[in-house]
Swiss-Prot record:
Coiled coil: none annotated. Belongs to the jacalin lectin family. The gene is JAL37. The keyword Ribosomal protein does not apply. The keyword ATP-binding does not apply. Signal peptide: none annotated. SMART domains: Jacalin (SM00915). This is Jacalin-related lectin 37. It holds the Pfam family FBA_1. Residues 295-438 form the Jacalin-type lectin domain. PROSITE patterns: JACALIN_LECTIN (PS51752). It comes from Arabidopsis thaliana. GO terms for molecular function: carbohydrate binding.
Length: 454
């Protein structure tokens, strides 16, 4: 899957490999992201998250979940990549930025986002090398760049390990000598290896290499490269200012021009694997109240009765398996959801007035079924009733009385509820939202390779 970025748009492009064709689905990026319609300086990918650096700062997003978080860049610092400390049990994502300080020293800042507070630490590193490109590759939490030695001009892969917070030369590249005019690209191959592409500036010929074995931060000296393919480009051909999807299958070759989807010179492409990894600390609390309501608690994903109470978010799972609902004489005042993830059942916290909860009053969701919509009513102060519509057409019992404005929360066709969030005051539920999975299009990859455009 390929990510291709274009101003304020994100487009999923479905590519049929059997009958060469594309189908485009376009969505707008949220307008509250500073610099979203400007020039994308850098676009990166890290374990399901896309990170883009504009002139105004850095955005971290999940295109499938349509979650984005924003951090302002440090003045005069250059974004170099995002990763995490792989020695810790949980992935605490970190942003690496640097600023040349002298001919032999670079200043750096590592920003960790595990809470609503952004934590930055200053560092200084001695160096006798430089980046060939600002683009990094994140693999198993570590960062890798194509770099060159200033004295010898030898090009190699430089690494940064967030667990030790150290730079280390990782391995040499197949083409040892650096030609700065050539185009080059380092990428992840088959999930755990590297691929390296280099295009000769004069001949336009392309060579692609891949590593033979899995990449680990500690085994750089053992890396072996093998040549995957060579592409000879005729002298009369020009690949400049031309965006295409090429489909090669057996002895068949097809070219689909997509210039209308990407703009020169602002197009950037990155390999991306769709994921349900949420953007870290996606609570919106660092934005204004108006923006928070617009982004989380507006249909069709969420509803807000009032802004009272404490915000909660159960997170994202694979499915919902059981629901506990509590009511008083009139209204729905308590919910608790039980989720499945990796063949395990995980119980979320209870939300609302737990004294109304009857342990025998629970909704069981049969295997193969899922919640496709949540419906109910609300007043100006709280949610009054709630029910759940299942994929197989069943409507669960209504909890609470029908009182106030009706609401219906649902995802795209084929999406299922995989998590809940909201606000509760201890007496009432004041807001409710649903994390929906991406539509099945993004999971049907046997003969299709979607492409995303920003």
């Amino acid at each position: 899957m390929e990510l291709s970025f274009k101003r304020e748009k994100i487009c999923s492009v479905e590519v049929n490999l059997d009958v060469p064709s594309i189908e485009v689905h376009s969505h707008n990026l949220p307008s509250y992201i500073p610099g979203y319609n400007g020039f994308f300086m850098t676009v990166e990918y890290c374990d399901g998250l896309v990170v883009y650096a504009t002139e105004n700062g850095i955005g971290i997003c999940n295109p499938l979940l349509r979650q984005i978080r924003w951090i302002k860049s440090k003045v005069n610092y250059r974004y170099n990549g995002v990763g995490y400390d792989n020695s810790r049990p949980e992935n605490h994502y970190k942003i690496f930025e640097s600023c040349p300080y002298s001919d032999t020293t670079v200043k750096a800042s590592i920003t960790e986002f595990v809470s609503d507070a952004w934590i930055s630490k200053p560092y200084e590193f001695a160096y006798d090398w430089d980046f060939m490109s600002s683009y990094s590759v994140s693999l198993n939490g570590a960062l890798y760049w194509v770099a060159f030695h200033m004295a010898s001009d030898d090009q190699f892969i430089q690494s940064f390990d967030f667990s030790t917070e150290k730079f280390e030369p990782y391995c040499l590249l197949p083409n040892k000598k650096c030609d700065p005019s050539n185009a080059r690209s380092l990428a992840v191959f088959r999930g755990d290896r590297f691929s390296y592409l280099e295009q000769n500036y004069e001949t336009r010929n392309i060579e692609i290499w891949v590593t033979k074995k899995e990449i680990k931060i500690e085994n750089g000296k053992a890396v072996e490269w093998m040549n995957l393919m060579k592409v000879s480009v005729p002298k009369w051909s020009s690949l400049r200012e031309k965006a295409c999807i090429y489909i090669a299958k057996g002895d068949k070759f097809h070219e689909i021009i997509i210039n209308d989807l990407v703009e020169y010179p602002t197009r950037h492409h990155r390999t991306y694997v769709p994921s349900l990894v949420p953007v870290p600390t996606f609570t919106m609390s660092n934005r204004s109240k108006t923006q928070q309501v617009e982004s989380r608690f507006t249909p069709p994903r969420g509803i807000q009765a009032s802004d009272g109470g404490n915000e909660w978010d159960d997170g994202i799972f694979h499915n919902v398996k059981k629901i506990n609902v509590g009511v008083n004489d009139f209204d729905t005042v308590f919910v608790k959801f039980h989720y499945s993830k990796y063949n395990r059942i995980e119980a979320g916290a209870g939300h609302g007035n737990a004294t109304t909860h009857n342990p025998d009053d629970e909704i069981m969701i049969a295997g193969g079924d899922y919640i496709e919509a949540v419906e109910g009513t609300y007043t100006e102060s709280h949610i009054t009733s709630i029910t759940f519509r299942m994929r197989k057409g069943d409507m669960m019992p209504q909890y609470g009385r029908l009182n106030g404005t009706p609401f219906s929360l649902r995802g795209e066709r084929g999406s299922k509820a995989i998590g809940f969030y909201g606000r509760s005051s201890g007496v009432h539920l004041t807001a409710l939202g649903v994390h929906f999975s991406p539509p099945p299009l993004y999971y049907s990859f046997p003969n299709h390779s979607p492409v995303f455009n920003y």
